[in-house]
Amino acid sequence: MRYVIITGTSQGLGEAIATQLLEESTTVISISRRENKELTKLAEQYNSNCIFHSLDLQDVHNLETNFKEIISSIKEDNVSSIHLINNAGTVAPMKPIEKAESEQFITNVHINLLAPMILTSTFMKHTKEWKVDKRVINISSGAGKNPYFGWGAYCTTKAGVNMFTQCVATEEVEKEYPVKIVAFAPGVVDTNMQAQIRETAKEDFTNLDRFIALKEEGKLLSPEYVAKAIRNLLETEEFPQGEVIRIDE
């Protein structure tokens, strides 16, 4: 049985990924602040299994313990492959550094960087000896490579995700049962995060007009299109180990 653990499944890209996997009779471990009832209905429709866990990714001091309880329920005997998709993220604060509050920085770092690091580490510890296909996909962003006015925290944490991914891949080189890991930048996706970006004051985000134009011109990628690309990463034999890739690369 294939297991896929996904964070941030209540809406947007995480929901689209979970939907496509459930249609393939995958067991999805859904982690978000609130349960997505539509995923539960879909699992019943396709005779799949969607197991929801409410987990506060900001609570980094208890995250390993809480995630360990979740992943410990999965036994190697029942697994043909196991994958982790660190999808949950936040772009806030969307304003120049001098305007942002310290608590906003802390929240951004906890959700975007520390949570993926802790979840990946716990995942690797639990599956260390498992002789199955193990993969981690960290959802990154082009902002991890390019600076944006008003996105100091987001750019910084996504750059951290990229480097973390590369470091883990380096550490897995000599392993007998290595974890495959990649950072994936999905492009500009038509989700609630993009709606939030378009509502930002222009003095706080100087690229605002570009993002509004992408929406008006129909150039945003659909969550379903991006989810398909991520699903392909879970299945391909030519896995881009340790790379930071953009969609369609």
Swiss-Prot record:
Record Pfam families: adh_short
EC assignment: 1.1.1.320
Activity regulation info: Inhibited by Cibacron blue 3GA, a general SDR family inhibitor.
Record field: temperature dependence: Optimum temperature is 50 degrees Celsius (at pH 6.5).
pH dependence: Optimum pH is 6.0-8.0.
Main location, first listed in the record: cytoplasm
Active site, per annotation: Y154 (proton acceptor)
GO biological process: tetrahydrobiopterin biosynthetic process
CDD domains hit by this protein: SPR-like_SDR_c
Enzyme class at the top of the EC tree: oxidoreductase
Source organism, top-level taxon: Bacteria
Gene Ontology MF terms in the entry: benzil reductase [(S)-benzoin-forming] activity; sepiapterin reductase (NADP+) activity
Residue ranges that the Swiss-Prot or TrEMBL entry lists as coiled coil: none
Cellular localization per UniProt: Cytoplasm
Family matches, as SUPFAM superfamilies: NAD(P)-binding Rossmann-fold domains
Reactions this protein catalyses: (S)-benzoin + NADP(+) = benzil + NADPH + H(+); 2-hydroxy-1-phenyl-1-propanone + NADP(+) = 1-phenyl-1,2-propanedione + NADPH + H(+)
Record key words, sorted: Cytoplasm, NADP, Oxidoreductase
Chain sites annotated for binding NADP(+): I6, N87, Y154, K158, V189, T191
Gene Ontology annotations for the cellular component aspect, listed alphabetically: cytoplasm
Family named by the database record: Belongs to the short-chain dehydrogenases/reductases (SDR) family.
Role, per record: Reduces benzil stereospecifically to (S)-benzoin. Can also reduce 1-phenyl-1,2-propanedione, 1,4-naphthoquinone, 1-(4-methyl-phenyl)-2-phenyl-ethane-1,2-dione, 1-(4-fluoro-phenyl)-2-phenyl-ethane-1,2-dione, methyl benzoylformate and p-nitrobenzaldehyde in decreasing order.
UniProt xrefs under NCBIfam families: PRK06924.1 (NF005381)
Name of the protein this chain belongs to: Benzil reductase ((S)-benzoin forming)
Gene label: yueD
